[in-house]
Structure formats: C-alpha cells, structure tokens
C-alpha cells in the first residue's frame, strides 16, 4: 500500500474523513469506492515534525492558495521530496518560488470530472480513462521523462489512467482553453457542463470563447 495523508482547511471535511473515510460514487464501470483515510486540518500540521517526511506532495488547492499552501507543507517534505501541482491553471512557478524548480512537477487533469458534494463524499462525473483518453497527464517543467515522473504516474494510475507527458505546458494551455470556454459561462448561467452542451446557444458561445482563448 501507499501511505497517504490528506490535509485540508475545511473542518467539516476533515472530521468526516477522520470518522467515516472517503466515499467516491458515480464511477462508471468501476462502481462506488469507500476507504478509510488519514486526514489532518491545516492547524494540525505541526505534529508532522515527529513523523517521516513526505516524499511526494500534491498541491490541490485553488490557484490563489498555492503559495501559502506550499509554504505550509514544505518544512515537512523530505529534502529530495517533490511537489506536484494537481491543479487547474498554471501554478508551477508559484510552487517553485518556495521550493525551487528542481522539485516541481505538474499534473493536468485532462478527462477526469468530479465534485465534492458533501464532507467526505465525492461524485465522479466521468468514466475511467484509457490509453485513448488519458485521465491525467504528469510532466516535468523541462519536458524530459524522468524516473520520478514515471513513479508518480504509476501511483496516480490507481485513480485514473495517467500518462507521462513531454509537453506539460501544452497540456496546461489546452486545459486552460477548455476551462475558458465553459467555466465562466457556467458561472453566468448556473448551468452544469451537460446542460451547456445541450444548449445550442451556449454551444455557440462556448466555441467563440474558445476562439478568444
């Protein structure tokens, strides 16, 4: 197995994970999954000083929280530990400003859609990917395929198909374009992705937004 620790700022979510674990539903072709996990609130991280340092840190916060989240966890990472931006947007530079570029990788969530619907409960809205449609793409900033990138890809493949990419920045801009065509439109209309696709008017707007991006 793999020793995983979740660290979150939402007290209700931390408490639910501690007492009930995590439940992932709606996984087409894979059923539902429930598993106990270790969860810490951000106010509890000081206790990590007595433990083995982290070998891999996944930064999975909103872009505006990237820098402080990295600063918070950096003291508890191994000297050779790496930091993976598992986020939308381009946040690798913010992470590198804290720990240095040599320790930073990026992971684009290409074809995996999910939402946290309640504390400790995640609904997945996309099927598992495969070699024709990768769910995740991880890469180094310099574009080389490295042993650590391959190791992390194998770990992430427990959640979805994962490919090591030599074009991280291309993956990032592709995802940004995808988000630009739909996220703002969804916020303005209150419609989900499926409803936007089904609306002829929204489809036209989405195409024009993608063209602008």
Task: Set out the residue ranges of the language-model regions.
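Short, glycine/charged-enriched secondary-structure capping and boundary segments
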Residues: 20-22, 71-75, 97-101, 118-123, ...
């Amino acid at each position: 197995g793999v020793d995983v620790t979740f660290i979150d700022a939402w007290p209700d979510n931390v408490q639910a994970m501690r007492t009930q674990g995590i439940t992932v539903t709606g996984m087409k072709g894979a059923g539902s999954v429930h598993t106990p996990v270790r969860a810490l609130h951000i106010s509890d991280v000081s206790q990590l000083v007595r433990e083995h340092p982290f070998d891999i840190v996944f930064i999975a916060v909103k872009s505006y929280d990237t820098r402080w989240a990295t600063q918070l966890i950096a003291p508890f990472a191994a000297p050779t530990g790496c930091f993976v931006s598992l986020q939308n947007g381009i946040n690798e530079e913010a992470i590198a400003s804290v720990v240095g570029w040599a320790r930073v990788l990026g992971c684009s969530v290409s074809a995996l859609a999910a939402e946290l619907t309640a504390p400790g409960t995640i609904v997945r809205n996309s099927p598992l990917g495969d070699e024709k449609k990768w769910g995740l793409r991880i890469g180094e900033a310099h574009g080389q395929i490295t042993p650590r990138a391959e190791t992390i890809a194998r770990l992430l493949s427990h959640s979805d198909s994962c490919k090591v990419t030599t074009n991280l920045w291309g993956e990032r801009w592709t995802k940004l374009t995808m988000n630009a065509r739909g996220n703002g439109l969804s916020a303005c209309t209150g419609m989900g992705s499926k409803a936007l696709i089904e609306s002829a008017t929204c489809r036209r707007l989405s195409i024009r937004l993608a063209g602008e991006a």
